[in-house]
Regions:
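C-terminal cap/substrate-recognition subdomain and adjoining C-terminal extension
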Residues: 105-262
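Alpha-helical substrate-recognition element adjacent to the catalytic core
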Residues: 3-137, 143
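Non-catalytic pre-domain segments flanking phosphatase-related domains
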Residues: 1-8, 16-19, 248, 254-262
């Protein structure tokens, strides 16, 4: 399987595109219309909520998410991403912080531009948005999960820093923690035999030969680079032995192996 690890902000969501703020009064009607027109089983109205009192600050974060995808993702950029996926047969693996909204919700958002069908049903480990706020027990479980995961990420980051030191004389040349998230995911998903990561963060240390730097959005040159990288099926991609610790395996047994998300 070919995987495209997708960041969103700075890749398909340009920081200069803020058109959603011109349409705040339309958010509720937009979510109702999308639910009806797309008819994909996702309730945008329920996801976004219906509260708005005329003050832009009262609109929910999820209403802004829907509007950002609808108003601010440039069609030409979406088509560049689609061209990579159609040409290579790759699936989207969300590496963006947006994945914390939950994969079900992200599929709904991607569907606004017809991209939901490309989404792989797993993502690098994160705590699903909203899942553990239902009662005191689940809130406690969420806190435990976050604590355990932070310790594992710190262990991975420390060893990855040692394995992939950056040039201290260059800006932003060091190892980025997102690289560790992707590498841990690849280690478990041996079905992936080709991958590329599109990101506005520097993921070159640890993803050598599989990273395309993007900012503020995907350009034609980066489309060609991504397609070329995905043409080389050189996987699977195991973690370095030094990272395969008992602590990592215990964390996976506790939080990952029984999950349907990771």
């Amino acid at each position: 399987m070919k995987a495209l690890f997708l960041d969103i902000d700075g890749v398909i969501q340009s920081p200069s595109d803020q058109n959603r703020f011109k349409h705040v009064e339309e958010f509720v009607d937009l979510s109702k219309r999308l639910t009806k027109e797309l008819n994909n089983g996702f309730d945008y109205y329920k996801f976004g909520g219906d509260y708005y009192d005329g003050n832009f600050r009262s609109a929910s974060a999820t209403q802004y998410d829907i509007a950002a995808v609808y108003y601010d993702w440039r069609p030409v950029v979406v088509e560049r991403l689609r061209h990579i996926l159609d040409t290579t047969g790759a699936k989207i693996v969300l590496s963006s912080d947006w994945r914390e909204k939950g994969l079900h919700n992200m599929r709904g958002l991607l569907d606004i531009h017809g991209l939901g069908k490309y989404l792989y049903p797993y993502a690098p480990f994160c705590v699903p948005y909203g899942k553990f706020f239902e009662d005191a027990y689940n809130l406690k479980q969420r806190c435990e999960m976050q604590s355990d995961t932070m310790k594992i990420h710190q262990m991975i980051d420390k060893k990855m820093h040692e394995l992939y030191p950056g040039d201290p004389n260059k800006w932003f040349d060091g190892y980025d923690p997102r690289t560790g998230e992707i590498r841990e995911f690849l280690d478990r998903h041996t079905e992936i035999d080709a991958y590329v990561a599109l990101d506005d963060r520097n993921l070159s240390r640890g993803l050598e030969g599989h990273f395309v730097s993007v900012y503020p959005f995907i350009e034609d040159e980066q489309v060609s680079q991504a397609i070329e990288i995905l043409s080389h099926q050189d996987g699977p991609y195991p973690l370095p032995d030094v990272l395969k610790t008992d602590e990592l395996e215990e964390w996976r047994k506790k939080w990952v192996y029984e999950s349907k998300l990771y």
